[in-house]
Structures are given as structure tokens and as C-alpha cells.
Regions:
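Extended ligand-binding clefts on enzyme/binding-domain cores
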Residues: 20, 48-51, 108-109, 129-320, ...
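Short, solvent-exposed positions on alpha-helices
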Residues: 68-71, 128, 132
Length: 336
């Protein structure tokens, strides 16, 4: 009898679903989501662009050796999102409006992935002109996006934004922003111990959260422990899907947060479906059979990742992107 994971990962693809190699996967993704000027488009968010997508696009272009697309994405990002007085980005760009940006606040995960992609471009691809910008962004993440943990003021929490709520009594925290490999590599490159400490403590907080009923998208950290966030609904949903991806990519597959999220995914009770969203009590809210989410399950369970096929290229931006990132993580970090 197959385990739950094995049953979910059995593809059953039709004959016309031809497998794609990594280069083909990248070209399909680029054709669907990257405009010629370098703007990465989220098709399910009214064709908006956001700092997360620009950061992911940079990372994927670098990983696939596509310098031209990398340059286009970075130039568009620099001209359209890097409007703040620091080195961080406004988080969202809305098309078909006179003022494309109506919220100048940043989203730290977008800045983190942009900085990491720029660092990798210089260090691994030899595109040296991007290193200084990577270091500048990393130092502003350190200076503006870290806050003391109210439970242990000597430890640092990664804030979801530079202006996010952070007081000695309550700090807003998004567990899915902890990409510890990126934080550590940027910390070493920038000679900034604060980023490395934030990576270490972030992994500790994720392990602590695995003792909660659900792994939350958002949570408040208080002197007495974890509490429902003031600005967001308490749930485990599409944000939290990234936690096992990032931990596995960072070589931390043994962190209990990985199995906590994957167990939730496998709780759907419907063949071939994943529970991609549950409420605070674990009640099912949304199911999906998208290959991108199945790839995260396979990565976290240390199984072989299903091949990406032509059928998968019809996915929307988010699962399509997570699928490519999961395969990249699998190539870069043998975590099991």
C-alpha cells in the first residue's frame, strides 16, 4: 500500500504531458510571466507586479544563466520599484493607472530575494556589477527590517517590512519570510552578523511555531509567547506553503516546521488534492492539485520530484514559480 505522500506524488499524467528539461521550464515560465521590459506579472492578481515576483524572477534568471533577462528584470525593478529613500523596494506596482504605486512600503521577502539574486549574479555568474547593490540592500534589511524578539530581546526577528509594527510588546512576524540560506549568505558577504543571527533565530522560531495547532501565515510575537496577529486573519495558507521549501533549500529539512506544514498539506482527505489553506483550528478552506504545491511536498518529504511537464506550464504565477524554485532547491541542496 502506498503512503499518503506516495499516492499524492503519483502523477498519472496523460501521454501528451511531455517532460521538460530545466532550460525549457525556464523559457516557458519566462514567456508567460516576464514582459520584454523585465516586469514580472502575477496573472491572478490583475496582472500586477510585486517585489516578490521581481526577486524570484531575478533568482531564476541567474540560476538558468539568462543574463539578458536578469538585466531587464533588474533594470525594470530599479526604475519602477526602487523609489524609496533607502535601498528597499515599494512592494507593489499596479498597471493601467497614472500612479502605479499607491503604497511605498516594502515587503522584506522581495528585498531579500532581490539582494540574494544580485549577490549570486556577482559571485556565481561573474556579473560583478551587481555586487555593490546586493550589499547595500542587505545592509538596509539589517538596519531597517530587524527587531528584538519581545521574549528574548537579545535575539532578532525579521520584520515583514521596514515600517511593520514592532514594539517591546508585540512584533508582527511572517514565518514564510525566513529564507535562512539567503540571510546567511548575505550576512557573510556584507560582514553583517545581524543577518546571520536573524537566520538562526528565525529557524528557532519556526521550530517553536511547529508546536502550535497550525503554522500561521502571520503571527504576533509577544513577551508571553505567540498571539493572533492584529492586522491579519490567523490561518495557515498560501504564505506558509513556502516554509518547507525555504528550510529544505537551506539544508534544514529536519526542522519540525517542515513536517508540520507537509502534514497539513496531506490532510485534505481527497485523492490527489492538497489542503493548501486551513483556518486557525485546522478546518479545511481550500484544496489544490497544482503541480507546484506537489513539488514542495516531494522536496520536503525527501522523495524524487515529479518532472515538470508541458501540462504544468498552464499553472498560474504562484504555483508555477514555486515549482521552479523547488526544482532549483533540489539541485542546489541535497537535504536528505
Amino acid at each position: 500500500m502506498m503512503s499518503g505522500a506516495a499516492a499524492l506524488l503519483a502523477t498519472g499524467l496523460p501521454a501528451e504531458a511531455a517532460p521538460l528539461d530545466p532550460g525549457q521550464c525556464w523559457r516557458f515560465w519566462r514567456a508567460r510571466f516576464v514582459q520584454p521590459d523585465g516586469r514580472v506579472v502575477d496573472d491572478l492578481q490583475n496582472a500586477t507586479s510585486h517585489s516578490e515576483g521581481q526577486g524570484y524572477g531575478l533568482l531564476l534568471a541567474q540560476a538558468h544563466g539568462d543574463e539578458r533577462t536578469f538585466r531587464n528584470i533588474e533594470e525594470w525593478t530599479d526604475h519602477n520599484l526602487a523609489i524609496r529613500q533607502d535601498n528597499l523596494m515599494a512592494w507593489q506596482w499596479i498597471p493601467r493607472r497614472r500612479d502605479n504605486i499607491d503604497d511605498w512600503h516594502n515587503a522584506t521577502d522581495g528585498d531579500l530575494f532581490r539582494a540574494w539574486a544580485l549577490l549570486r549574479a556577482a559571485r556565481d555568474s561573474g556579473w560583478w556589477e551587481y555586487r555593490d547593490k546586493a550589499i547595500a540592500i542587505a545592509r538596509d534589511i539589517s538596519a531597517l527590517c530587524l527587531a528584538p524578539d519581545p521574549r528574548a530581546p537579545g535575539e532578532l526577528l525579521l520584520k515583514p517590512g521596514a515600517e511593520s509594527r514592532a514594539t517591546p510588546e508585540r512584533v508582527l512576524f511572517n514565518p514564510s519570510y525566513i529564507m535562512s540560506r539567503a540571510l546567511r549568505e548575505l550576512g557573510y558577504a556584507a560582514d553583517d552578523d545581524r543577518l546571520i543571527r536573524a537566520a538562526d533565530h528565525g529557524e528557532t522560531v519556526l521550530a517553536e511555531l511547529s508546536r502550535e495547532s497550525v503554522m500561521p501565515d502571520w503571527i504576533d510575537v509577544t513577551p508571553g509567547g505567540f498571539d493572533a496577529p492584529q492586522e491579519h486573519e490567523l490561518r495557515s495558507s498560501y504564505d506558509a506553503l513556502r516554509i518547507p521549501l525555504y528550510l529544505s533549500w537551506s539544508g534544514r529539512n529536519g526542522n519540525p516546521a517542515v513536517s508540520h506544514v507537509l502534514d497539513r498539506l496531506e490532510s485534505a482527505g481527497a485523492p490527489g488534492k492538497l489542503a493548501v489553506s486551513v483556518d486557525a483550528a485546522g478546518g479545511l478552506r481550500d484544496l489544490s492539485d497544482h503541480a507546484g504545491y506537489l513539488a514542495i511536498l516531494a522536496l520536503g518529504r525527501c522523495g524524487p520530484l515529479p518532472e515538470i511537464t508541458t501540462q504544468d506550464t498552464a499553472q498560474s504565477y504562484y504555483p508555477a514559480t514555486l515549482q521552479l524554485l523547488a526544482h532549483l532547491a533540489n539541485r542546489e541542496q541535497r537535504h536528505c
